[in-house]
From Swiss-Prot:
Compartments it resides in: Cell membrane
Source species: Staphylococcus haemolyticus (strain JCSC1435)
Name of the protein in question: Putative hemin transport system permease protein HrtB
GO cellular component: plasma membrane
Superkingdom of the source species: Bacteria
Keywords: Cell membrane, Membrane, Transmembrane, Transmembrane helix, Transport
TM segment ranges: 16-36, 232-252, 278-298, 316-336
Pfam families on file: FtsX
PANTHER family named among the record's database cross-references: ABC TRANSPORTER, MEMBRANE PROTEIN, HEMIN TRANSPORT SYSTEM PERMEASE PROTEIN HRTB-RELATED
């Protein structure tokens, strides 16, 4: 540790430069990762927060909640088996400050309602609970809104946490309000557990299918289209990080060959030199990534609620671990070089 720290202090400018590069790369990785997660949550946060493992939907080639049309006969048969009421969605356009915004209206059994950030669940026919993202349009509990093509005013009774599906904010309504507002609806059944007997019974109902959450998210076009390029960008940045660290530490090692030779000649073991190099890689990487995380955390605090950005601590921890692994991979050439240094050749004894 002492050897590693002394070397960092002696070559402070070089190590500051590599920390700055890691900081910039780390900031880019964390920001793009946060953007990817934020966009993902805008697509599937409703599904992620739903206490259900299975969904009973219309039997289509590509099952989607918004296109699940179950007739009354199918609903009656399903409800006799699972003893649950249906969840229904309807697409509407909300008028906000003279602007139109597409939203999804929702009516669902009480135990499946999204959690509230503030306010109360709608009880009256003229009350609604809105997704938290809509508060970015200066909406709050107590405000009234209208839907395009309708003249009724609806009072906001509550704000729901993370309630979005396919980039559309969700609006919770009671059964009567939902029916009076929506003429075209999609119907499905979120179910937590389905036993073997119920699965067999459901298979006998024509035109329905039991799917899991992944089957639904895979069929959200915007989810797949956004995640793939963003994840490729993150992978590319990790590759760039490995190349940069590899080049930096390899050049540093070549420049230090005479010193390494002298240290070996006076009895310093190779494992101590490798340990010093390892500690330098860990220290420079950790400092750069922690600084990047701090800056992104500060930026996140000032981002508006409408910005699709999200970073979890587990995600940040994973990024730090990946950066360390990438740094070690990038330093493999330096490790090999240190191992091969011959003290006599390094200090010019063979000339």
């Amino acid at each position: 540790m002492n050897l590693a720290w002394k070397e960092i202090k002696f070559y402070r400018f070089r190590y500051t430069l590599i920390m700055l590069i890691i900081f910039l790369l780390g900031s880019m990785v964390l920001f793009i990762s946060g953007l990817a997660q934020g966009l993902a949550r805008e697509n599937i946060s409703y599904l992620n927060n739903m206490p259900a493992e299975h969904y009973i939907v219309e039997d289509n080639k590509e099952p989607k909640l918004e296109s699940s049309q179950l007739n009354q006969s199918q609903q009656n048969k399903i409800e006799k088996i699972i003893h649950e009421n249906a969840t229904q969605m309807g697409t509407q356009t909300l008028k906000i400050n003279q602007q139109d915004q597409d939203v999804i209206t929702l009516n669902t059994p009480k135990h499946l309602t999204p959690k509230l950030v503030s306010g109360n669940y709608p009880k009256k026919q003229n009350e609604i609970a809105i997704s938290e993202k809509l508060t970015g349009n200066d909406l709050k509990v107590g405000d009234t809104v209208t839907f395009k093509g309708h003249h009724h005013n609806y009072k906001i009774s509550g704000i729901m946490n993370e309630s979005m599906y396919s980039h559309s904010s969700m609006i919770l309504m009671n059964k009567e309000a939902f029916k009076s507002l929506n003429k075209q609806v999609s119907t499905f059944y979120p179910v937590d557990k389905i036993n073997k007997d119920n699965k067999e019974s459901l298979k006998q109902i024509k035109g329905i299918k039991v799917v899991n959450e992944k089957a639904l998210t895979d069929n959200i076009a915007s989810y797949q289209a956004e995640q793939m390029p963003l994840n490729l960008m993150i992978i590319s940045l990790f590759v760039i990080t490995a190349i940069v660290l590899s080049a930096f530490f390899y050049v540093m090692t070549i420049q230090k060959i005479p010193q390494i030779g002298i240290l070996k000649a006076i009895g310093i073991k190779t494992k101590h030199l490798l340990t010093a190099l390892l500690l330098q890689i860990i220290l420079t990487t950790m400092v750069g990534v922690i600084l990047a995380f701090s800056v992104i955390l500060i930026l996140n605090a000032f981002m508006p609620v409408t910005m699709p950005f999200y970073l979890s601590y587990s995600q940040v921890l994973l990024m730090i671990v990946v950066f360390l692994i990438v740094g070690l991979i990038g330093a493999l050439l330096s490790f090999i070089k240190v191992l091969k240094v011959d003290p006599i050749e390094a200090i010019g004894g063979m000339e």
